[in-house]
């Protein structure tokens, strides 16, 4: 290959890379999140400058309930919502053109970083003891609510005989202590605080019945935004991937990052059970949620997993 042509191709490659970074730098990204450690990889990406290094100006904004995130994305008050997959699928099923940008927390067999916590003075011996109880969930139709109902079904319990009410993570300890609910489905670090305070006890992590790993949180945005900002999407995905690798091997980094975005006593952060993180959103993971939700009659339309993942 002639040398001038080689130099020209190198120059074009460099210029394209610089242009992509510059384009991304012009884009402000506001991410809505809820008070759970499943967002640790995103927190790490922000605190370690992984977004900034790629020319992104990212801000994380606390939202009380996960079920509120699609509306916030649609209104433009946030760019991405850290939606649970079940919330994203319901939004798409309802007609919103939203797509998954990147992943965050994932489930795995034997996981205990989230679960159902029964109030200390309420008896519990078996899954059917939830019948007639009032259970607080951080978003009706969100991850914990849907996965817990799936566990009830697999244990022969009609979830329609359980009353569910929405309770934000920050209010769970007080609502449970006050006797307003019998149990909550929750995650770390809130779960650890409730248990450590003697307010309740974890009775199940409701993952022993799962056949495969499932994504918990996906950063989702409008299809229109993703298609108009491919450089920013790629930069965001790369930053989350680097942060997930850090989160999966550095517990101290996870605890420090969670402490910065979820205000809890230091002893709660130090003792919280940690999860796992995965940046890639897979068709198999989305399809697994479609199956679980169809079993609960939560979807009106057929959803093709590959159509809601930003490429």
Regions flagged by a language model, labelled:
Residues 45-48, 54, 72, 76, ...:
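Structured segments of extracytoplasmic/periplasmic soluble domains
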Residues 26-155, 165-166, 182-188, 203, ...:
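Short, glycine-/small- and polar/acidic-enriched structural segments
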Residues 86-87, 122, 170-257:
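Pocket-lining segment of extracytoplasmic ligand-binding domains
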Residues 226-298:
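Secondary-structure end/capping motifs
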Residues 53, 108-109, 208-211, 276-285, ...:
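Short, solvent-exposed loop/beta-turn-alpha elements that line the ligand-binding surface or hinge
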Residues 19-22:
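N-terminal signal peptide c-region/cleavage motif recognized by signal peptidases
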Residues 1-11:
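Bacterial N-terminal signal peptides that target proteins for export
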Residues 294-311:
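Conserved C-terminal helix/tail region of periplasmic/extracytoplasmic solute-binding proteins
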